[in-house]
Amino acid sequence: MNITDIRTKSPLVLTYANFVTPQFVANVVNVVGASPLMSRELAEFKELAGIANAVIINTGTLQKVEINDIIKLSQEAYQLGKPVVLDPVAVSVPFRSKAITQFLASGHVDVIRGNAAEIAWFADIDFASQGIDATGKGDVIEIAQRAAKKTGAVIALSGACDVVSDGQYTQTLDINVEQLSSIVGTGDALSSLIGAFIADGLKVPNVMNAMATFKLAGQKAATKTNQPGSFTNQLLDELFVIDNIDVQNFVKESVLNHG
């Protein structure tokens, strides 16, 4: 989908949300024209997965008792043919590493969205990180490609240089918007936004369109303010009015294809 399709069809994006950023995530999904829905209740997963167009699983505040829940949700989505996006927040922390390993063994995932440090974990590449922010340096293209090949998922690596790869075909967007890293929840929001863009089909360009839309909106917002509070509001405003022609021009000018 592109932004025009989303506003016309209003896909329902179901997010298994953490309890830190759900309102911001819902606002981002809503302002682009999609319909956000949050749930952490196992009893309704089958019904909600049935009506959703995409399912996002965010492990930012995952607890041990919830591991089987996210596996079940991903299985329900898979059986119904709904794309699943995994946001493995701080996956290199031992408890989270174990939980995600268990999830990958028994659950289902179509897209993994994370920062460079998080994606490097899936690629078995050492990468310095601190909390939710990646601070190490490495070849992000290689990291994304290796992670895609190891997991079988499309990888969406976000940061100063965004990379989307299925292991064979890779796209990059090398434009840094520093203000996006000043707000807690931009990664969470991007993961759910990707869900809206892949609601009618999982393709690398669809995932990149989501990332380009988010980064272009951030770039526009940054020209108007660099204060985190006002930037948050301006980002939502830019996403609300962003035009598909602007996004496609941005993609043509800034996105590079690799293989």
From Swiss-Prot:
UniProt KW keywords: ATP-binding, Kinase, Magnesium, Metal-binding, Nucleotide-binding, Thiamine biosynthesis, Transferase
CDD domains from the UniProt entry: THZ_kinase
Keyword Magnesium: yes
Residues binding ATP: R113, S158
Pathway this chain belongs to: Cofactor biosynthesis; thiamine diphosphate biosynthesis; 4-methyl-5-(2-phosphoethyl)-thiazole from 5-(2-hydroxyethyl)-4-methylthiazole: step 1/1
A Gene Ontology molecular function term of the record: ATP binding
Binding residues annotated for substrate, in chain numbering: M38, G185
Biological process (GO), any one: thiamine diphosphate biosynthetic process
Coiled coil spans: none
Cofactor: Mg(2+)
Leading EC class: transferase
InterPro entries: Hyethyz_kinase, Ribokinase-like
Reactions the enzyme catalyzes: 5-(2-hydroxyethyl)-4-methylthiazole + ATP = 4-methyl-5-(2-phosphooxyethyl)-thiazole + ADP + H(+)
EC number from the UniProt entry: 2.7.1.50
NCBIfam families: PRK09355.1
The family this protein is said to belong to: Belongs to the Thz kinase family.
Function: Catalyzes the phosphorylation of the hydroxyl group of 4-methyl-5-beta-hydroxyethylthiazole (THZ).
UniProt protein name: Hydroxyethylthiazole kinase 1
Organism: Leuconostoc mesenteroides subsp. mesenteroides (strain ATCC 8293 / DSM 20343 / BCRC 11652 / CCM 1803 / JCM 6124 / NCDO 523 / NBRC 100496 / NCIMB 8023 / NCTC 12954 / NRRL B-1118 / 37Y)
Gene name for this UniProt entry: thiM1
